[in-house]
Curated annotation (Swiss-Prot):
Gene that produces this protein: aroK
Species per Swiss-Prot/TrEMBL record: Methanosarcina acetivorans (strain ATCC 35395 / DSM 2834 / JCM 12185 / C2A)
Reaction(s) this enzyme catalyzes, per UniProt: shikimate + ATP = 3-phosphoshikimate + ADP + H(+)
EC class (word): transferase
Matches recorded under InterPro entries: GHMP_kinase_C_dom (IPR013750), GHMP_kinase_C_sf (IPR036554), GHMP_kinase_N_dom (IPR006204), Ribosomal_Su5_D2-typ_SF (IPR020568), Ribsml_uS5_D2-typ_fold_subgr (IPR014721), SK_arc (IPR010189)
Sequence similarity: Belongs to the GHMP kinase family. Archaeal shikimate kinase subfamily.
Subcellular location: Cytoplasm
Protein name as annotated: Shikimate kinase
A single MF term (Gene Ontology): shikimate kinase activity
């Protein structure tokens, strides 16, 4: 007998990177990751594959399936395949989206239900245990799974606030990759008192100011160019940041700012692509699309 499950989760952009203080904020973006799980009776383990990235690291998605099976005391073997619109290792929460989609697809395969935050926490645990994240990225995982803007305390694994927002999002995704687990935590911790100030702004709902302050702080600490942020400010954008630990930049923009900022970023000369999307407010459970894995 074969048990099959499909799910989708969304990417996210950074408002406050939690590495410095363990407190973060993020927003969902309308870029999707799909997961397809097939399970059978047996004990030979879980084998994962990432569509379009044959050499990709599959430990996270495999471990997500394993944790769900362990949670319900099931001994099954099988496969998990993921496919994504989110650039890998670009600071756009590809790992959080993959973990969320993998956990949800496995739950659907075995016919079980868990509360949304418990699903998120299983994915965060998997990410920590395989070492793809520094803080567990609970903020990113919440934004990916729940949609909207979220503010979190990652150490306590607590969702402090969530609200929906309507905005276009412009992302510059350089061709080079930067894996979160490789980031310079020591330098990030030096800026903690100032990141705390940005977090206070986010708690007050001043997300764009919080995001921009976060961006300048982390660009300085991690050695990324601030030119992309300054170009956005020149275009009248008020919310722009390095996303995650880079190398992507994300800006919350009005429809009339899209064209100008796109051309400003393209003129900066770094190899990469500009992605136009919007804030996603839908949660992963209610979204039934399967997209690229159909």
């Amino acid at each position: 007998m074969t048990f099959e499950g499909h799910a989708c989760a969304f990417g996210a952009g950074t408002i406050i990177n939690a590495i410095a203080t363990w407190k973060g904020a993020a927003f969902g973006v309308d870029l999707k990751t799909f997961a397809e799980v097939s399970l059978f009776e047996g004990k030979s383990g879980i084998k994962g594959s990432i569509e379009g990235t044959p050499e990709g690291d599959t430990r996270l998605i495999e471990h997500c399936v394993e944790l769900v099976l362990e949670r319900f005391g099931l001994e099954l073997e099988g496969t998990i395949i993921t496919g994504s619109e989110i650039p890998l290792a670009g600071g756009l929460k590809s790992s959080s989206a993959a973990a969320n989609a993998s956990v949800l697809a496995t739950l659907r395969a075995v016919g079980e239900i868990l509360p949304p935050l418990e699903i998120v926490k299983l994915g965060v645990r998997a990410a920590k245990e395989v070492g793809v994240t520094v803080t567990g990225a609970f903020d990113d995982a919440c934004a990916s799974f729940l949609g909207g803007i979220v503010v979190t305390d990652n150490r306590k694994m607590e969702l402090v606030r969530r609200e929906e927002a309507d905005s276009k999002v412009l992302i510059f995704a350089p061709s080079k990759k930067a894996f979160s687990a490789d980031t310079n935590v020591k330098r990030s911790r030096l800026i903690a008192p100032y990141v705390e100030m940005a977090y206070e702004l986010a708690l007050k709902g001043e997300y764009e100011r919080a995001m921009t302050l976060n961006g300048f702080l982390y660009c300085g600490a991690l050695g990324f160019d601030t030119e992309y942020m300054l170009k956005a400010l020149e275009c009248g954008v008020t919310g722009v940041s390095l996303s995650g630990t880079g190398p992507s930049y994300a800006a919350l923009v009005k429809a009339e700012q899209v064209k100008e900022l796109k051309s400003a970023w393209e003129s900066c000369g770094m190899e990469g692509k500009v992605i136009e999307t919007s804030i996603n407010n839908r949660d992963a459970i209610s979204f039934k699309g399967r997209g690229s894995l159909e």
